[in-house]
């Protein structure tokens, strides 16, 4: 998926990795980008993420992103940490901070990867102004069994689906 996306990227200064987990994306992104900004709220994987990107140009933000600023609980999957996810029923009452990307001072970025186990649409809703400002290549995971479609949301703002690799869709402008 990365290689498919790289063909469309024109700005290799900064990449955003939303749902960084243990660094499966953040680490290889540093081979192409000067700086990677990672977002990962799961305390159970943060130490591994920090070790995997040690001495690399990666900034780790230890909070979740979403549609509104709030708090939420996370459901941890110890068998496959990549399946850990936001507990949608706990917005406003959880112990993990949620911020909107649109409220943050992020530098111009050429690529944004969002893989947050069915929480992609709320993240996009809270990031759309920043995305429209920078018009990066967007990689977003989409599940066929979800009620929403992150891709349709992006298309409603003028994004074009460039290609997909299994459940990962690549959009551009």
Predicted regions, residues:
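Phosphate/nucleotide-binding beta-alpha loop and adjacent structural elements of enzyme active sites
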Residues: 1-173
